[in-house]
Amino acid sequence: VESDKNGDDLISDILSAIEKKGDVDDTKVKRHSAYLNLEKQMREQIEALQAACTASLGNTPNDKTFVATFIFDDVEPQGVEDSTLKLYGLSNRPFKPNQLNLARIFTKLPNVAWIGDTPLDSDEIEQSLMSAAFSGALYAPHMIDKFPLYTHRINAVKMGVRITDQHKVRLGAYLGEGTTLMPGASYVNFNAGTDGAMIEGRISSSAFVGKGSDIGGGASILGTLSGGNSIPITVGRNCLLEVNCALGI
């Protein structure tokens, strides 16, 4: 759903799009979106989005549009919009790792440069480099990646987690309340996470760690993106992985 940057028709546009899905089993939608009350909370969130659109008028380029995305069937990602929505679904915690179809998500997200929370594609990078060369300004992206940072998109304080280095967590990571990422070798990939653990090592995609466990400094849990490992690994509650160890199947 696309709407003008003023957001004047955003609510009606979105609700009209939902109504077009009249053949969708409403109970199924609610079951897979249990965190949303479709009659109340969705409208409240849409109104909050509308207010945000209006508030950002002065900072929004005229050629930008807002896109609202809905997923009714959990098929593999089709583009940037539904890929990003699924990553939000994990990091906001309505879904846990391995509950959403993320097959081939790498092919749907472009590799971009990030300056703050703003992604730049190849053409925009060229423009920024040229502008910096002539103006003496500094072109300094903090990373080149397909995924936004967790802390740039999620209210980590509200989620009850501690993250000592913003670059250690991608959007799409599931961090349960009480999770702490310590300085150093800690890292949580997308489609991975914890129910509230102390993380001083690496949790790869598809891996999950139970509440009260401690992943020691430099320890690594292999994920399904690792060569030769196709089985998601779960570490239970109150477990300890000692420093510099590796866990895989």
Question: Over which residues does each language-model region extend?
Answer:
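Terminal amphipathic alpha-helical/low-complexity segments used for targeting or macromolecular assembly
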Residues: 1-154
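Structural signal for interior beta-strand "rungs" in well-ordered beta-sheet cores
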Residues: 156-249
